[in-house]
Amino acid sequence: MATTRMVRVSQDGSGDYCSVQDAIDSVPLGNTCRTVIRLSPGIYRQPVYVPKRKNFITFAGISPEITVLTWNNTASKIEHHQASRVIGTGTFGCGSVIVEGEDFIAENITFENSAPEGSGQAVAIRVTADRCAFYNCRFLGWQDTLYLHHGKQYLKDCYIEGSVDFIFGNSTALLEHCHIHCKSQGFITAQSRKSSQESTGYVFLRCVITGNGQSGYMYLGRPWGPFGRVVLAYTYMDACIRNVGWHNWGNAENERSACFYEYRCFGPGSCSSERVPWSRELMDDEAGHFVHHSFVDPEQDRPWLCLRMGVKTPYSA
């Protein structure tokens, strides 16, 4: 791949561009050069769209607390600089940030949907792209915060908050050392695997799940698709998690096909003996498939994640 290109975004006019979207627009279609868009501290209030074929883009901030991409679209009310025929409608089109370009990286960025509680589906970011990685990022919202729609994604040291189905979609995702915060009652995940032949699913590895101080109000997940697959391994769960753990989305047939697994989790919310009978604890040999990076980086002769982790470009580069 060609030499990395650096551009800087600053809302005060001191950078190469004043808006994140202007910087993205400068990247050519079919891009093969890693383009690092360095975001100066600030709250960037506009919807952001990374189109298909604008690949190898990095968003880099100094700290997620002071570098925020935010907008307030909901599934029922979308204001965007792109037409609905481009970004979609409803939940699919309402993301504050929409990423469709492959090999995307974000570091030290907050992705927020600022629509208030009770607004319905309000996505902070939708990722419809392969080989994407997020490091030390925050994802803020209420319902449907993080839409991991399609492709393979890796999240490390991230903070994700919400209430209803706030990590959802049908990608293959590994979330490692992440903090999952449950703001009010609902469901953490809604994974939508449609067939047992699909390799998709969400793995939470060495994560921490916290709540708002109340007990027993949050489910670990429910199957948006009949074969929804979620694995929690070596993860701390506080008392916000309901003892039963999982929900069938009002359809008993889902209990025959959903794949909801736990492995060596701990904390007051990890009541494995009281879980619904159609979820289960993995055996050691079964867990091996899920607790390694190969879950999202399966091709040993064409690895992407190990290379990605070695070529991260810090903000100061």
Swiss-Prot record:
Fully active at 0 or 30 degrees Celsius, inactive at 55 degrees Celsius. Keywords: Aspartyl esterase, Hydrolase. It catalyses: [(1->4)-alpha-D-galacturonosyl methyl ester](n) + n H2O = [(1->4)-alpha-D-galacturonosyl](n) + n methanol + n H(+). It is an enzyme of class 3 (hydrolase). Substrate binds at T91, Q121, R222, W224. The active site is at D144, D165. It holds the Pfam family Pectinesterase. Its EC number is 3.1.1.11. GO terms for biological process: cell wall modification; defense response to Gram-negative bacterium; pectin catabolic process; pectin metabolic process. One of its GO terms (molecular function) is pectinesterase activity. This is the only member of the pectinesterase family that do not contain a transmembrane or a signal peptide. Acts in the modification of cell walls via demethylesterification of cell wall pectin. Acts in a blockwise manner, resulting in a cell wall rigidification. This is Pectinesterase 31. It comes from Arabidopsis thaliana. The gene is PME31.
